[in-house]
């Protein structure tokens, strides 16, 4: 709390979640962080708040488990980093995995949060694959 790690200093997801809670539009929020780097700023900001749950993606099964225990949330917020891609620094997720993540979030929000979810762009360094990965996540979000 006495220093910063770049992106944690201006924390878009934390500002957006705090503002929605301040306005009273939501009470309980589940934050899903799919960026390669652990969101220590986000985690720190909400660590003492039982109404905000934070999950940093390690695998899709973990995301499924996190969502299953957060059925009482009013909103799902996604820190949408794309540097976990197999052609980026993380070497973990495929483009199809981003579609799966988007679908999991959208289905959860539809079932438990009156359809309320949003995402903010975080990391992603390989410009050759960044656009298609963002598109894949958005396609997963589209429940039509």
Please report, for each region that a protein language model flagged, where it lies by residue.
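A general "terminal functional-core" signal
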Residues: 1-144
């Amino acid at each position: 709390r006495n220093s910063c790690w770049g992106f944690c200093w201006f924390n878009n997801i934390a500002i957006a979640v705090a503002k929605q809670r301040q306005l009273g539009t939501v009470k309980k929020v589940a934050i899903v962080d799919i960026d390669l780097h652990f969101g220590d700023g986000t985690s720190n900001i909400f660590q003492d708040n039982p109404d905000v749950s934070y999950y940093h993606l390690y695998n899709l099964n973990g995301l499924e488990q996190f969502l299953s225990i957060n059925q009482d949330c009013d909103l799902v917020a996604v820190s949408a980093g794309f540097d976990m891609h197999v052609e980026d620094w993380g070497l973990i997720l495929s483009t199809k995995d981003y579609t799966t993540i988007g679908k999991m979030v959208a289905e959860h929000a539809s079932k438990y949060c009156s359809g309320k979810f949003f995402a903010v762009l975080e990391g992603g360094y390989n410009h050759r694959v960044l656009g298609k990965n963002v598109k894949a996540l958005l396609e997963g979000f589209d429940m039509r």
